[in-house]
Amino acid sequence: MSAVRLGRRPLALGLGALALMPGSASAFGEAGAFRARLLVAGAGHTDEARVQGASRWAQELVRRTSAPGRPAPDRVEADRPALFREPFVVWSGSDDVGALSMSEVRGLERFLRLGGMLVVDDAEPSSGAFGRSARRELSRVLPEAPPVRLEATHVLFKTFYLLDRPVGRVLGPTHVEAIVRGRNAVVLFLSHDLLGALARRGEGWAFGVEPGGTEQRERAIRFAVNIAMYALCSDYKDDVVHAPFLLQRRGRAR
């Protein structure tokens, strides 16, 4: 059975070298399971519906792939040791985050330099206040690495499903912006409210998806799965994703 070796991101954070083997989620171990933890930093706040969206993210990964996920939501502070226990965090909000403290800046800098991955998910892209302020503060964290555009040709859009653009609760721009270090995108800036598309309330969805409704929500879920796979397998080779088996697997509906 072939295996895809996980990249440096979990290894650098002390999670060990793990293997992704189709049909064997236990190969990751508990420490290697994907969890979309919520970052607490500055004056930002993540509403409860989107916290549940983070839980749904892991559930959809488990349901659609052979990768393991941990759906239990968790909040981690940027200046606390708990940040370093897992390699993935989401920073979601709708308002200006204010100025991060120096301890928060140092914590995020260390997390990202060790190989952690951060997704900045603007819950109100129409105003853009959260996204702009997050970019401003992250320029203090990694001043030498300005954001760049990731077009649909980037491996992020091929890790499991073949996608032609990012989407979320709103359609948003056709590209993703990212801070790239070495070969890896360590920060993704999303102007699509991805957690809003994943969030559920009771037996239904917490928010409507515009303008594409059900089809757009499915595409948003697929995009979330791709991000999770990218986080787990950060050393994905661009040529590997063209293998016929993977093309067939990612292209079919789940």
Regions found by a protein language model. Give the residues of each.
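N-terminal signal peptide c-region/cleavage motif recognized by signal peptidases
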Residues: 22-24
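Extracytoplasmic/secreted envelope proteins and their assembly/folding machinery
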Residues: 51-58, 105, 109, 131, ...
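Sec-exported extracytoplasmic/periplasmic mature domains
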Residues: 62-66, 113-116, 139, 143, ...
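Short alpha-beta junction capping motif
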Residues: 88-131
